[in-house]
Amino acid sequence: MKRVLIIDVLNMYLRSYIVVPSLSTNGQPIGGLVGTIKSLQKLARETKPDHIVFAWDGPNGSMKRKIMDKNYKEGRKPIRLNRAFHNLSEDEETQNKVWQQSRLMEYLNIMPVIQTILPEIEADDVISYITQMPYYKGWQKIIVSNDKDFMQLCDEETVLMRPVKKELLNKSRITEQTGVHPTNMALARAIIGDASDNLPGIKGAGFATVAKRLDFLSEEKTYTIDEVIEHCENSNSTLKFFSNVIEGRELVEHNYKMMQLYSPQMSIQAKTITKEAIENFEFTFNKTELIKMMNIDGFSDLNLSDLTAHMNRIAREN
């Protein structure tokens, strides 16, 4: 079975930016850049993919969901380095973060990897669309992200790799861990809410509670909000959970629209652009330019022999 890595690249980059302490030869932070490239090398070595796709959040990527909910993702703290660089002001640190991200795109551009970035579209929706593309039918799709949102996309061909947790999740393991089948994951999370996206849930509802009180969500059958409400209405239990879900129906419906990825929020045009970019991509690798860029950026001593070997293989086999 062929294999495609689908990487939530901003998730990976920001994690590296925060925790990787690498400095260039002139003393500037380059942890986001170096950490992401090293992560790519590790992933290529461990999974030996045939294709690699990096999905970026587009400019104003959250716009569609912010129109639906103005408080979406509000209250998030600014991303800052978790170590002190006394020579960088806050503005300089922000400029450095943006530069590293832009430079990372340039590095990826000289490798046989596909990058997608579309205005007003989040990477989550693009990743969902890619997993559903007929082009990749019969391939193993490995989504690389620490974001739990992608659990809902796992099926016979799609798995989720969460690097921080060091776990590879298929649909069976997700069901075992959470008590909820991926086909019902968005519904369960709509009840629970998502504090990281500023989406409050039903009071007193966590994964354990939802899995216990709505145990049918562990089935592969796709359940609806109507069926959940009906179950709660027919329950003889006096537990507040059931009445809270009934009273919070509008909140659950709203959260579901915000969270579900089964039907990605992409126009036909955006889907066509993504489809053509992937199907018509030319797989080339410029190792000489890679070495040149590493010298310029001050980390030429980094051993990327495994990465270059896999990039050569991908370019050759495609």
Predicted regions, residues:
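Non-catalytic nucleic-acid-binding/docking modules located in mid-to-C-terminal regions
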Residues: 46-56, 71, 75-77, 112-113, ...
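Noncatalytic, basic helical substrate-engagement surface that gates or grips nucleic-acid strands
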Residues: 2-142, 150-168, 260, 265-280
